[in-house]
Structures are given as structure tokens and as C-alpha cells.
Amino acid sequence: MAKDDSTVRCFQGLLIFGHVIVGMCGIALTAECIFFVSDQHSLYPLLEATNNDDIFGAAWIGMFVGICLFCLSVLAIVGIMKSNRKILLAYFIMMFIVYGFEVASCITAATQRDFFTTNLFLKQMLMRYQNNSPPTNDDKWKNSYVTKTWDRLMLQDHCCGVNGPSDWQKYTSAFRVENSDADYPWPRQCCVMDKLQEPLNLDACKLGVPGYYHSQGCYELISGPMDRHAWGVAWFGFAILCWTFWVLLGTMFYWSRIEY
């Protein structure tokens, strides 16, 4: 392929533009995944206690892939400008590996959405909230963080239980074993609080008087952020894969035409 051919120069320009976009997308993907793994809503303990925090694993992979995409796009641009077969061959080998990792990240993130069900968080809450008799130290740690997370959620977001306060009444739970139904029909955090974080009217809260306890469940406040992050990692990653596929295909065609 003659390097002074205007058609070749135009094709080189298109490939360079394509790789610039790939590099920028890599930076954006890394930033998105960093935001996700930083756990802005502090919900990681709830996922870890289910022994399935794969969505965070997908985000860590996405972060690694984003950095690699940026570096490889720079390598590809250098190889295209120099029309160097060896540089581009090294680029292809590494890009295929990175591409495979990103496919795994997208699939993992997309499939995790079906995992975030009400029954999952309900079972976990009933089993671990204020459970002071864990069988192992690992369970003790998980119970402690699950309890702290639920206390914060109910106080901060003005909700109670997964579906509502009735969760504490209808189902057997570690909380019910530790507390009497008369004094603690539901956790104190379900009560409407005053400025000092004390129940506005404890008796009214225990009796379930409207306006003195939170009747809304916390499920939407838990699943919403997780779903958004899962779809963000999955579909933005998928869009990057689609763009990268065509850029990679064009680069392979260019590589095949470079003279030895």
C-alpha cells in the first residue's frame, strides 16, 4: 500500500478518528466504573451478604478495560501513522484479550439485574438484621454491616423494611427473636424522628398511627441505584464494543494491505 496515496491517507484519518473515540470511551468507562465501585449509596454490604457481588466485579473489570482501551488506542494510532505491521499485530493480540474481558463484564452486569429481587433482600434482612448469634465470625461481620446499612437506610430515606413495616410482623426474623412484639413491632428506625433523632411519638409509632411511622418499603431505594449501575456498566460497555468492533475490523483490513 503506497503511503502517499490520498485514499490511504483518508482511510488512515478515519481509523485514527475511530481510535480517538475508542480512547475517549475508555476514559469515560473507567470514570463510570470508579463511580460505581466507590459505592455512593453504601449498599455493598447488602450485596456481599448475599455472596453475590458480581456486579462490583463487572465494574472492576470495566475499569481495567477502560484503561486498556485508552492505552491500546494510542498504540493503534502510532501503528497506523507509521504503517508498522508489528505494532499493529501487537495491538490486535492485546485488543482481542481486552475485548473478551469487556464482553464478560457486559454479560455479568446485564444478567445481575434479575438478581435484585424483593425476596433476596427480604430473606437477607430477616436473617441478618440484629442477629447476635451468628455461627461464624464471617457471619458476625456480615450481620453487623447489614444491620448498620439497614439502620442508615431507614433513618436517612424514611422507609421501613423491604416492602414495608408489615415485613417485621408477617415473617419470622432474628429481630423478632431478640425483641418482643409489643415493644418492638418494628425497629425504632421506622419511627418518624424529631431533630434529635428520637421518635416523635414512640407509643403512636408502636401502634402504627399514620404520620408517626414510615409505611414505605426500602426496596426501590436499594434496587434502583443497583439497577442503574448495572445497566450503565452493561449497555455503555456494549456500545463501546460495537464501535470498537468496526474500528478493529477496519484496522485489520488496513494491516492486511501494508507492504512488508
Swiss-Prot record:
Component of the asymmetric unit membrane (AUM); a highly specialized biomembrane elaborated by terminally differentiated urothelial cells. May play an important role in normal bladder epithelial physiology, possibly in regulating membrane permeability of superficial umbrella cells or in stabilizing the apical membrane through AUM/cytoskeletal interactions. N-glycosylated with high-mannose oligosaccharides. Residues 1-15, 81-86, 251-260 are cytoplasmic. Heterodimer with uroplakin-3A (UPK3A) or uroplakin-3B (UPK3B). The chain crosses the membrane at residues 16-36, 60-80, 87-107, 230-250. CDD domains: uroplakin_I_like_LEL. Residues 37-59, 108-229 are extracellular. GO terms for cellular component: apical plasma membrane; apical plasma membrane urothelial plaque. It is found in: Membrane. Keywords: Glycoprotein, Membrane, Transmembrane, Transmembrane helix. Belongs to the tetraspanin (TM4SF) family. One of its GO terms (biological process) is response to bacterium. It is a multi-pass membrane protein. It comes from the Eukaryota. This is Uroplakin-1b.
